[in-house]
């Protein structure tokens, strides 16, 4: 089996990554940064997001597992003290693969140039680069509303505990193939109205944003931030691809939610 390790870059994470690499090589595993079967993320959720985007083009062949050394390890289910146990599990235990839905983002342009396509594991956001975002919102090909406000956040179920939660969105279990649209400071008065609530769209339902002409947009996809000009539309839907996580033991979603947001430390 081929593996690679991505570290957060701090001293403790680098030390753990080096230790795991030596252990796995001793077990006869092959270090392969280009085509790994397993990617081990050592850090926090941000490190795993970087790992996902590095290998997004081979999601059918690569699975991820995380060792938590960061501030929040929602995707990482192993502690630094369990590194030896994890290595032995990888070497000797048949593992289960759990799949999570992803968000597909397609940006199309007024001038007809080639569209830009992205995958998000947590969320994608859109804001105006110069003030209020004004955009038509279409759902399933039909006009839904005209949004005016700071921006919109479109999240995956696993990403619903991140920015989406801070915006008042619902937490969705990753077994549900859906995307969620949450507003950022929408303008609502006698003249302008939005639905004012997060929307949950199931698989095969598409949301298309059509921004006002001449608007420069700041678009994020997970940790990536870009400015796009001359945007005709942005399409969001549940992606055909899924991210795969290696599981050697139960890692209940609701327990993670409770431990992250409710349980006493």
From Swiss-Prot:
GO cellular component: cytoplasm
GO molecular function: ATP binding; metal ion binding; NAD binding; NAD+ kinase activity
Cofactors demanded by this protein: a divalent metal cation
Active-site feature positions: 45
Any Pfam family: NAD_kinase_C
Lineage start: Bacteria, Bacillati, Bacillota, Bacilli, Bacillales
EC number(s) reported in the record: 2.7.1.23
Reaction(s) catalysed (UniProt annotation): NAD(+) + ATP = ADP + NADP(+) + H(+)
Name of the protein in question: NAD kinase 1
């Amino acid at each position: 089996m081929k593996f690679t390790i991505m570290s957060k870059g701090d001293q403790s994470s680098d030390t753990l990554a080096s230790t795991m690499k030596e252990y796995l090589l001793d077990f006869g595993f092959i270090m392969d940064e280009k085509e790994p079967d397993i990617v081990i993320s050592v850090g926090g959720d941000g490190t795993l997001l970087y790992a996902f985007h590095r290998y997004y083009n081979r999601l059918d062949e690569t699975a991820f597992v995380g060792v938590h050394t960061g501030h929040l390890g929602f995707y990482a289910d192993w502690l630094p003290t369990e590194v030896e146990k994890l290595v032995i599990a990888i070497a000797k235990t048949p593992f289960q693969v759990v799949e999570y839905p992803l968000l597909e983002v397609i940006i199309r342009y007024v001038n007809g140039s080639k569209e830009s396509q992205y995958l998000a594991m947590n969320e994608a956001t859109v804001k105006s680069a110069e003030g209020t975002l004004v955009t038509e919102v279409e759902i399933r090909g039909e006009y839904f509303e005209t949004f005016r406000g700071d921006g919109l956040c479109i999240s995956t179920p696993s990403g619903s505990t991140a920015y989406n939660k801070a915006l008042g969105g619902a937490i969705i279990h990753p077994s549900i193939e859906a995307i969620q649209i949450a507003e950022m400071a929408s303008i609502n008065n006698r003249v302008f109205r939005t639905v004012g609530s997060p929307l949950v769209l199931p698989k095969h339902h598409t949301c298309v944003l059509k921004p006002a002409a001449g608007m420069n947009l700041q678009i994020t996809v997970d940790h990536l931030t870009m400015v796009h000009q001359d945007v005709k539309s942005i399409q969001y839907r549940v992606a055909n691809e899924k991210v795969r996580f290696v599981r050697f033991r139960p890692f209940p979603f609701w327990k993670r939610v409770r431990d992250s947001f409710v349980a006493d430390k």
